Protein backbone atom coordinates (compact mmCIF):
# COMPACT_ATOMS: atom_id res chain seq x y z
CA UNK A 1 0.00 0.00 0.00
CA UNK A 2 2.83 2.42 0.86
CA UNK A 3 4.53 1.59 -2.42
CA UNK A 4 1.36 2.39 -4.34
CA UNK A 5 0.97 5.71 -2.53
CA UNK A 6 4.60 6.65 -3.17
CA UNK A 7 4.23 5.74 -6.84
CA UNK A 8 1.14 7.94 -7.16
CA UNK A 9 2.95 10.89 -5.56
CA UNK A 10 5.93 10.53 -7.92
CA UNK A 11 3.68 10.24 -10.98
CA UNK A 12 1.71 13.32 -9.88
CA UNK A 13 4.87 15.41 -9.47
CA UNK A 14 6.22 14.33 -12.85
CA UNK A 15 2.91 14.96 -14.63
CA UNK A 16 2.30 18.36 -13.03
CA UNK A 17 5.92 19.47 -13.54
CA UNK A 18 5.86 21.41 -10.28
CA UNK A 19 8.28 24.28 -10.07
CA UNK A 20 8.72 24.75 -13.82
CA UNK A 21 10.14 28.16 -14.69
CA UNK A 22 10.18 29.55 -18.21
CA UNK A 23 13.58 30.65 -19.55
CA UNK A 24 13.68 33.52 -22.07
CA UNK A 25 16.36 35.35 -23.99
CA UNK A 26 16.63 38.89 -22.56
CA UNK A 27 18.33 42.13 -23.48
CA UNK A 28 18.60 44.57 -26.36
CA UNK A 29 20.32 44.28 -29.70
CA UNK A 30 22.67 47.13 -28.74
CA UNK A 31 23.60 46.00 -25.21
CA UNK A 32 23.90 42.26 -25.83
CA UNK A 33 21.63 39.39 -24.91
CA UNK A 34 21.57 36.62 -22.32
CA UNK A 35 19.04 34.19 -20.83
CA UNK A 36 17.12 34.39 -17.58
CA UNK A 37 14.45 32.48 -15.70
CA UNK A 38 11.19 34.41 -15.70
CA UNK A 39 9.58 35.59 -12.48
CA UNK A 40 6.38 34.04 -11.14
CA UNK A 41 3.42 35.02 -13.30
CA UNK A 42 5.55 35.75 -16.36
CA UNK A 43 4.76 32.87 -18.70
CA UNK A 44 5.48 34.53 -22.05
CA UNK A 45 8.74 35.32 -23.88
CA UNK A 46 8.70 38.27 -26.27
CA UNK A 47 10.86 39.77 -29.01
CA UNK A 48 10.00 43.34 -30.02
CA UNK A 49 11.32 45.25 -33.03
CA UNK A 50 11.07 49.06 -32.90
CA UNK A 51 11.86 51.02 -36.07
CA UNK A 52 14.63 53.55 -35.47
CA UNK A 53 15.19 54.64 -39.08
CA UNK A 54 15.34 53.31 -42.63
CA UNK A 55 16.31 49.63 -42.35
CA UNK A 56 17.31 50.18 -38.70
CA UNK A 57 15.47 48.43 -35.86
CA UNK A 58 16.08 48.20 -32.11
CA UNK A 59 15.31 44.68 -30.89
CA UNK A 60 14.44 43.94 -27.26
CA UNK A 61 13.67 40.58 -25.66
CA UNK A 62 12.47 39.35 -22.30
CA UNK A 63 9.81 37.81 -20.07
CA UNK A 64 6.31 39.20 -19.63
CA UNK A 65 2.90 38.34 -18.20
CA UNK A 66 1.05 39.67 -21.27
CA UNK A 67 2.22 40.13 -24.84
CA UNK A 68 3.25 43.77 -25.41
CA UNK A 69 1.70 45.84 -28.19
CA UNK A 70 3.74 46.65 -31.28
CA UNK A 71 4.64 50.25 -32.04
CA UNK A 72 3.18 51.85 -35.17
CA UNK A 73 6.10 50.74 -37.36
CA UNK A 74 7.32 47.87 -35.21
CA UNK A 75 6.49 44.24 -34.64
CA UNK A 76 6.19 41.84 -31.67
CA UNK A 77 6.57 38.06 -31.43
CA UNK A 78 5.33 36.26 -28.29
CA UNK A 79 5.83 32.59 -27.46
CA UNK A 80 5.63 30.20 -24.50
CA UNK A 81 8.57 27.77 -24.73
CA UNK A 82 12.12 28.05 -23.39
CA UNK A 83 14.34 30.45 -25.37
CA UNK A 84 11.76 30.71 -28.15
CA UNK A 85 12.47 34.45 -28.59
CA UNK A 86 16.03 34.13 -29.97
UniProtKB/Swiss-Prot annotation:
The lineage of its organism: Eukaryota, Metazoa, Chordata, Craniata, Vertebrata. It is found in: Secreted. GO terms for cellular component: extracellular region. Belongs to the three-finger toxin family. Short-chain subfamily. Aminergic toxin sub-subfamily. It comes from the Eukaryota. CDD domains: TFP_snake_toxin (cd00206). Disulfide bonds join 24-45, 38-63, 67-78, 79-84. This is Synergistic-like venom protein. Residues 1-21 form the signal peptide. InterPro entries: Snake_3FTx, Snake_toxin-like_sf, Snake_toxin_con_site, Toxin_cobra-type. Coiled coil: none annotated. One of its GO terms (molecular function) is toxin activity. Expressed by the venom gland. The keyword Iron-sulfur does not apply.
Amino acid sequence: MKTLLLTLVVVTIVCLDLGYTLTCVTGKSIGGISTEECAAGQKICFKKWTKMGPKLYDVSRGCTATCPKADEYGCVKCCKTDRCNK
